[in-house]
């Protein structure tokens, strides 16, 4: 309802489906969206542009998710398109329906690119006209002699049905390989799970191979990638006249919107699915982030959704739960459902892929229900607060000197935002910052929150003037352990801090170290929850996404990086002292000498704050975006 050729849309979800409509869509956290609501600029260095040259035509049984998984597998791990813009151009685009284009485009987020946009044609014109916005169409094509930084050749004819194994969309294998050798491939997945979760919880996938065939327990088609009309219609065509069986295989289908849900009902698609035994749910993307159809413990689910990150589907490893999710296209999921849960490729099933030519869009369902208040303010209307709606705690400005206590060390190759703050059941607490913060890293490191709270208690004592180099006066409302006080006082002594510095020019905050944090969702809560717990920084070798780094800055978390050649020896409970941190941020330094206290010894380390513009530095000095706008009177 917002996209148009040549436009740009900034959305608060990491997945955007606008590129196929000639719109540059970028997913960002709430802080960046707030800047736009206040009519400020979206500041971005000019990104590199990658040409995705699309040729060929999709084979029978191949859908948009197969293309997307193949693309993710080719470019994610090597960082080929990270923070770049993809331009889809070529004769192959004309053979794709709009739903197929959108289904590929929405998954470009999983390549780590910044955004993606497609050249437009008559199909885009007709799509916009169908939605009552014919005037928003204009042809978009590269100019003659257009120069690109990189090239990806995407031959649709070469794509076959694919599968993305746990725990990332880039773990791409052909479905043909997985069907032929399920034991070997799934054994590797079990080893990766063991390496990440240790002996606390185990994932058993190889025992699902019976007589050489892989049996799965659940199939789901849902969300912004899976729940498109063409995908669901193709699934219904595959299942037409058959059934999913009465065994332990479950199959659920979620449409993406009420207008599409209505069209599926009116065209009889939903009827055919229901008769096959599929469960047709309301339009909701819940299964994608663990808010619906959570698999059973140790189950294997095949899904046409966007992600299969660890625990994103809703499992809780801290309670002994773990499940595996394999991403597949809706067509092969339906083929598997037709085979009662035995993994099957849609390429091996006869069905009619004919795309519905007489599509309809009934906007009345929105007109009757959606309130449109933009440009019609009602300042006298009171806000209604419930008991679970709470104010944000006061967030301090950046101090002159900073003492960080390490409260989590995550040495996985990548740390996702789903691990930093789970979604699903926690979403009901997003209006209550303190309650939501209790779930921070709960499915990855259950000890983080208690450790962060202990660090925050030390800072509360210090700020109250009750924590000195050798003495402490406990306050009843500040729960602090004597051993924590002794540890921080020893840190003061080793660092040579004087009484005046501790009382007036120091802040004690927590810090998370991760090799590469922030892959996945745009949810700013991945950063804000750390800040609510009095976190002060992240330290990493690189940030997985621009949007997570922006979230850190907007919430006042210093986004420090390490040089690739520098090892990080810090452990939970260690301290990192950064002298003159406020002065260095203010004057634009990108190098920050620091001291790591590890094992009773001091070690000099260097932290970096690179590619940080003047506005970002102002936000960091103020403590967060809220403070920044409060100071400006906005």
Where are these regions (language model features)?
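Fe-S-dependent hydro-lyases/dehydratases of central metabolism
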Residues: 1-634
């Amino acid at each position: 309802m917002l996209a148009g050729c040549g436009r740009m849309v900034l959305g608060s979800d990491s997945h955007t489906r606008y590129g196929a409509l000639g719109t540059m869509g970028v997913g960002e956290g709430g802080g960046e969206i707030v800047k736009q609501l206040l009519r400020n600029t979206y500041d971005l260095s000019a990104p590199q542009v990658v040409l995705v040259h699309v040729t060929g035509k999709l084979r029978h049984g191949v859908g948009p998710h197969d293309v997307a998984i193949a693309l993710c597998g080719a470019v994610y791990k090597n960082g080929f398109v990270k923070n770049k813009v993809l331009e889809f151009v070529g004769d192959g685009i004309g053979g794709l329906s709009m739903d197929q284009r959108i289904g590929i485009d929405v998954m470009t987020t999983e390549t780590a690119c910044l955004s993606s946009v497609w050249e437009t044609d008559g199909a885009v014109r007709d799509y916009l006209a169908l939605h009552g916005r014919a005037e928003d169409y204009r042809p978009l094509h590269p100019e003659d002699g257009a120069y690109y930084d990189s090239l990806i050749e995407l031959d649709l004819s070469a794509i076959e049905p694919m599968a993305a194994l746990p725990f990332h969309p880039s773990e791409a294998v052909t479905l043909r390989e997985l069907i032929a050798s399920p034991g070997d491939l799934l054994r590797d997945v079990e080893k990766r799970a063991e390496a990440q979760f240790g002996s606390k919880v185990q994932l058993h996938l190889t025992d699902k191979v019976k007589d050489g065939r892989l049996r799965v327990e659940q199939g789901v088609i849902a969300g912004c990638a899976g729940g498109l009309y063409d995908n669901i219609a193709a699934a219904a065509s595959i299942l037409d006249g058959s059934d999913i069986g009465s065994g332990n295989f479950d199959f659920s289908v979620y449409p993406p919107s009420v207008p599409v849900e209505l069209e599926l009902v009116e065209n009889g698609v939903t009827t055919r699915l229901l008769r096959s035994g599929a469960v047709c749910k309301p339009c909701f993307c819940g299964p994608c982030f663990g808010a619906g159809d959570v698999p059973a413990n140790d189950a294997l689910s095949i899904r046409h959704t966007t992600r299969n990150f660890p625990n994103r589907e809703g499992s809780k490893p801290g309670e002994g739960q773990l499940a595996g999710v394999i991403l597949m296209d809706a067509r092969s999921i339906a083929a598997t459902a037709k085979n009662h849960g035995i993994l099957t490729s849609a390429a091996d099933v006869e069905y009619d892929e004919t795309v519905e030519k007489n599509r309809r869009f009934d906007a009345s369902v929105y007109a009757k229900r959606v309130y449109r208040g933009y440009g019609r303010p009602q300042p006298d209307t009171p806000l209604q607060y419930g008991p679970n709606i709470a104010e944000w705690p006061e967030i301090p400005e950046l101090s002159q000197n900073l003492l960080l206590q390490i409260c989590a060390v995550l040495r996985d190759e990548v740390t996702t935002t789903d691990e930093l703050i789970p979604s699903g059941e926690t979403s009901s607490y997003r209006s209550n910052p303190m309650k939501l913060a209790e779930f921070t890293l709960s499915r990855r490191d259950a000890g983080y929150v208690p450790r962060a709270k202990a660090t925050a208690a030390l800072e509360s004592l210090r700020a109250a003037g009750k924590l000195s180099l050798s003495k402490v006066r406990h306050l009843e409302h500040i729960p602090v352990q004597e051993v924590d006080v002794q540890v921080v006082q020893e840190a003061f002594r080793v660092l040579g801090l004087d009484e005046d510095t501790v009382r007036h020019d120091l802040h004690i905050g927590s810090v998370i170290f991760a090799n590469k944090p922030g892959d996945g969702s745009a949810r700013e809560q991945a950063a804000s929850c750390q800040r609510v717990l009095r976190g002060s920084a992240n330290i990493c070798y690189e940030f997985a996404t621009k949007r997570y780094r922006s979230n850190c800055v907007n919430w006042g978390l210093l986004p420090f990086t390490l040089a690739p050649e520098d090892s990080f020896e810090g452990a939970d409970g260690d301290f990192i002292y950064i002298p003159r941190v406020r002065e260095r941020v203010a004057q634009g330094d990108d190098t920050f000498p620091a001291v790591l206290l590890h094992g009773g010894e001091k070690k000099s380390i260097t932290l970096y704050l690179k590619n940080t513009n003047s506005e970002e530095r102002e936000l960091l000095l103020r403590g967060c975006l809220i403070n920044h706008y409060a100071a400006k009177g906005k």
